[in-house]
C-alpha cells in the first residue's frame, strides 16, 4: 500500500517563495537569442550532433527556397516505405530485421538474420526470481516507473554493469531489447493483480516467436492471437523504433551516455523522458479525445457536427480545454508523417477484422477535416497532418492492450533506437554534452541573519 503524503501549508508557502524568485522574463529569451527547447525561432531543432542512424526530411529546396514536402524517414539510408514493403511483402516480421539494420548499419543476410534472431531469443531471459523479487514485490500504478525501476535493478545482477567497452554495451543493449516486452507486460500483470484485484498469470516467452508475437502471447490469458494482430503490432514497433537523435528521449540517451555512465542508467533516463506526456503519451490523449467526441457528438457520421466539435477543441471548449486536436501535427513533419501513411492501411485491415469499421471511419473523417479546420482557426497554412500517434492508440485498443501499456510498448520499440544512439555516441564522441545557460540573476550583497526580512 502506498504511504500517504500531503502538500502542507508550509510547502505551499515555500512554493510561493520559489515562484516569486525563479520566474524569468520571457522577453529575455528573444533579447539574448536563447534557443528555448533547443529550437530556433521557427521551431527547428538546433544542430547538436551528427548521426548515421536515421534521416528525417520535411523540407526541400525549390529554386533556392526552403519548401515543405511530403515527410520522409530513412533507417540507415533506406526509405521506410521500402523497408516495410520489403519485409511485409516477403512475409517476415520486421522488428528483429530493423533492429539489426539500426544497430549495425546494414541489412542482414538470411543467415545473419537467423543468427541474430537466435541471439535475441537467447537474451530473452531475466535473472532467476527477478519477476518475483523485483516486479511483484512493489507493483506501481505507472508501468513506465515499473519499467525504469526494473532496468535500474538489472544493474545489480550484472557483474560487468559499469564496463562501457563497445562489446559489453552491445551485450547489455541486446539483453534490454530482448527483455523489455517481459518487463513491461509482467509489470502490468503485477499491477492488475495487486492493485486491481484481477487474476495473475505469467507466461514465459516462446523462443520461436517474434517480439510482436511474444508481446501478445505474454499479455493474453489464453496466449492466442491472429496473424493480422501480430503483423500490425510488429509494424507499430518498426514505425516507433527510431526517429532521429533530437527527440527528447534519444537526446537524453546521448546526454547521459556522454557522461560515461552505465547502460542501465542511460536507458532508465530515456524512460523517464518518454514517460512525460509531451513525449510518449500522445496516443492516450488521442483516445481520450475521441471518447469525449463520441459523448458530445450525436451523429458521428455528420461531418458538420464533427467539425464543430473540432473547432470547440481549438477554442478550448472541449475535452481537456488545452486547445489541441491530439494526433494532428508534428514538430518536424508538416505535409505528412510517412509513418502514419504506412500505418493507416494496416489499421483499416485490423479494424475490418475486429468489426471496428465505424471507429476507423470516424478517425478517417477527423484526419480529413482537422487540417482545414486548424488552418482556418489558427491561420496555419504550411500544412498539418496526422502523426503516427493519431492511429496507434486505436490499434492498441483493438489489440486489447490496456492503456497502462501504451507508452511501455512505445519503449519496447524505441529501446532499439536508444541502443543504436548510445553505441554511436560511445564510438564517435569523447566530450561530455554541456550546453551553456545565460545567468540573468542580478548580483546582490549577503545579508546578515538579523537583518533579513
Label every PLM stretch briefly.
Residues 2-453:
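Non-transmembrane, aqueous-exposed alpha-helical and coiled segments at domain scale
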Amino acid at each position: 500500500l502506498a504511504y500517504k503524503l500531503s502538500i502542507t501549508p508550509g510547502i505551499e508557502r515555500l512554493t510561493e517563495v520559489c515562484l516569486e524568485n525563479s520566474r524569468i522574463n520571457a522577453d529575455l529569451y528573444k533579447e539574448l537569442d536563447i534557443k528555448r527547447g533547443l529550437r530556433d525561432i521557427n521551431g527547428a531543432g538546433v544542430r547538436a550532433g551528427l548521426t548515421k542512424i536515421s534521416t528525417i526530411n520535411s523540407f526541400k529546396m525549390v529554386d533556392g527556397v526552403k519548401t515543405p514536402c511530403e515527410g520522409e524517414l530513412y533507417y540507415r539510408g533506406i526509405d521506410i516505405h521500402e523497408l516495410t514493403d520489403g519485409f511485409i511483402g516477403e512475409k517476415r516480421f520486421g522488428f528483429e530485421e530493423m533492429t539489426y539494420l539500426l544497430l549495425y548499419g546494414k541489412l542482414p543476410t538470411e543467415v545473419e538474420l537467423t543468427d541474430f534472431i537466435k541471439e535475441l531469443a537467447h537474451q530473452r531471459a531475466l535473472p532467476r526470481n527477478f519477476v518475483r523479487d523485483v516486479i511483484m514485490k512493489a507493483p506501481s500504478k505507472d508501468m513506465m516507473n515499473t519499467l525504469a525501476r526494473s532496468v535500474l535493478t538489472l544493474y545489480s545482477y550484472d557483474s560487468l554493469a559499469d564496463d562501457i567497452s563497445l562489446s559489453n554495451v552491445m551485450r547489455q543493449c541486446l539483453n534490454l531489447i530482448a527483455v523489455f516486452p517481459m518487463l513491461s507486460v509482467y509489470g502490468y500483470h503485477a499491477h492488475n493483480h495487486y492493485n486491481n484485484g484481477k487474476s495473475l498469470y505469467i507466461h514465459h516467452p516462446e523462443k520461436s516467436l517474434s517480439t510482436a508475437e511474444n508481446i501478445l502471447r505474454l499479455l493474453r490469458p489464453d496466449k492466442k492471437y491472429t496473424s493480422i494482430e501480430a503483423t500490425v503490432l510488429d509494424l507499430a514497433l518498426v514505425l516507433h523504433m527510431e526517429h532521429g537523435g533530437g527527440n527528447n528521449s534519444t537526446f537524453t540517451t546521448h546526454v547521459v551516455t556522454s557522461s560515461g555512465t552505465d547502460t542501465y542508467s542511460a536507458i532508465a533516463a530515456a524512460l523517464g523522458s518518454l514517460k512525460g506526456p509531451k513525449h510518449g503519451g500522445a496516443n492516450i490523449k488521442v483516445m481520450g479525445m475521441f471518447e469525449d467526441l463520441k459523448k458530445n457528438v450525436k451523429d458521428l457520421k455528420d461531418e458538420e457536427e464533427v467539425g464543430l466539435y473540432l473547432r470547440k477543441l481549438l477554442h478550448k471548449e472541449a475535452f481537456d480545454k488545452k486547445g489541441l486536436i491530439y494526433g494532428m501535427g508534428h514538430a518536424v513533419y508538416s505535409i505528412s508523417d510517412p509513418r502514419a501513411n504506412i500505418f493507416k492501411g494496416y489499421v483499416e485491415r485490423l479494424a475490418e477484422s475486429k468489426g471496428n469499421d465505424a471507429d476507423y471511419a470516424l478517425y478517417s473523417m477527423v484526419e480529413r477535416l482537422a487540417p482545414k479546420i486548424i488552418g482556418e482557426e489558427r491561420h496555419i497554412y504550411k500544412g498539418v497532418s496526422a502523426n503516427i500517434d493519431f492511429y496507434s492508440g486505436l490499434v492498441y485498443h483493438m489489440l486489447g492492450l490496456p492503456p497502462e501499456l501504451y507508452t511501455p510498448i512505445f519503449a519496447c520499440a524505441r529501446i532499439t533506437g536508444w541502443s543504436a544512439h548510445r553505441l554511436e555516441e560511445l564510438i564517435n564522441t569523447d566530450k561530455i554534452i554541456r550546453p551553456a545557460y545565460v545567468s540573468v540573476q542580478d548580483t546582490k550583497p549577503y545579508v546578515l541573519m538579523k537583518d533579513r526580512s
